[in-house]
């Protein structure tokens, strides 16, 4: 599934490089790894930050991909 979705960052631990996004459509929270963040700067997210992303099947279930801050 590569449809773009929007959501808010629930939490993100910059030291460990991962967190979760709460999709705007009310679906289950989605895991996000820092490597999925599209940025030329330090790849981190802030709590309650608005993002656009797609969902791909990761090793442990659905994971955010191509994450862009809005």
Curated annotation (Swiss-Prot):
Entry keyword DNA-binding: yes
The organism's place on the tree of life at top rank: Bacteria
GO CC entries: cytosol
Residue span, CSD domain: 7-67
Inducing stimuli: In response to low temperature.
Annotated GO MF terms: DNA binding; nucleic acid binding
Gene3D superfamilies according to UniProt: 6.20.370.130, Nucleic acid-binding proteins (2.40.50.140)
Subcellular location(s) per record: Cytoplasm
InterPro entries membership: Cold_shock_CspA (IPR012156), Cold_shock_domain (IPR050181), CSD (IPR011129), CSD_CS (IPR019844), CSP_DNA-bd (IPR002059), NA-bd_OB-fold (IPR012340)
Keyword list, A-Z: Activator, Cytoplasm, DNA-binding, Stress response, Transcription, Transcription regulation
GO BP terms: regulation of gene expression; response to cold
Record-given protein name: Cold shock-like protein CspG
Origin species: Escherichia coli (strain K12)
């Amino acid at each position: 599934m590569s449809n773009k979705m929007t959501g808010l960052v629930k939490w993100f631990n910059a030291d460990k490089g991962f967190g979760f996004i709460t999709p705007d459509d009310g679906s289950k929270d989605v895991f996000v790894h820092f490597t999925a963040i599209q940025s030329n700067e330090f790849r981190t997210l802030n709590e309650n930050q608005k993002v656009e992303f797609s969902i791909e099947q990761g090793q442990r279930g659905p994971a955010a991909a191509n994450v862009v801050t809005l």
